[in-house]
């Protein structure tokens, strides 16, 4: 199979980078958006909430069991900053199909599970579960506060905030504590709808 990049929907790209020297398959699903002070905390919180459960696997225990059936597949969340863009999403990995017992296919069900997290997250009353949003919001705020404890990261962030105060580049990849504190399950769900409609 050759390396390729193809637009599968408007603003949605599939990039394939085959590498036979590895014994694992890796799948990355990323949302790339302009870094924006008002939306950065929402974007940073979104993958953490989506990774808490799907309608089929509504909690971490059920998700963990589903991953265990795929030989210990792992799915982690990512929140990165690349210039004036914010990249958030998931990275999943599993044993490459070539090494699975009995030739079992693992990549497709792993991709389906990531697809469920993105497209069929657990909801109640048309919104994300309040419990999940509040729990992950606390984690996000803790991560924002923890930057102060690392002198190098804190100095770098403050430098960018001062030098690039009026530019997207000055915004932290995690957003700010004040905005994060105001997020609710309703506002996060509405943000996700706007976020995905921008891509369409």
Predicted regions located by residue number:
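N- or domain-start disorder-to-order transition segments that initiate the globular core
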Residues: 1-24
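Glycine-rich, mobile lid/loop segments that gate access to catalytic sites or pores
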Residues: 140, 148, 159
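M16 family metallopeptidases and their MPP-like homologs
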Residues: 15-17, 23-43, 60-116, 152-175, ...
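Acidic/histidine-enriched alpha-helical segments
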Residues: 64, 120-144
């Amino acid at each position: 199979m050759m390396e390729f990049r193809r637009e599968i929907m408007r603003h949605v790209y599939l990039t394939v980078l085959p590498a036979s020297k590895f014994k694992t398959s890796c799948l990355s699903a990323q949302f790339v958006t302009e870094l924006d002070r008002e939306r950065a905390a929402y974007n940073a919180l979104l993958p953490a909430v989506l990774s808490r459960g799907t309608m089929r696997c509504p909690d971490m225990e059920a998700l963990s069991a589903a991953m265990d059936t795929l030989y210990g597949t792992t799915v982690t969340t990512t929140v990165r900053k690349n210039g004036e863009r914010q990249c958030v999403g998931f990275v999943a990995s599993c044993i490459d199909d070539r090494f699975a017992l009995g030739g079992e296919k693992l990549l497709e069900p792993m991709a389906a599970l990531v697809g469920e997290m993105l497209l069929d997250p657990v909801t109640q009353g048309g919104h994300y579960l309040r419990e999940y949003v509040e729990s992950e919001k606390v984690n996000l705020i803790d991560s924002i506060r923890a930057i102060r404890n690392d002198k190098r990261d804190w100095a770098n962030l403050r430098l960018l905030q001062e030098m690039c105060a009026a530019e997207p580049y000055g915004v932290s990849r995690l957003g700010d504590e004040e905005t994060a504190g105001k997020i609710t399950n309703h506002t996060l769900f509405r943000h996700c709808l706007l976020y995905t409609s921008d891509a369409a």
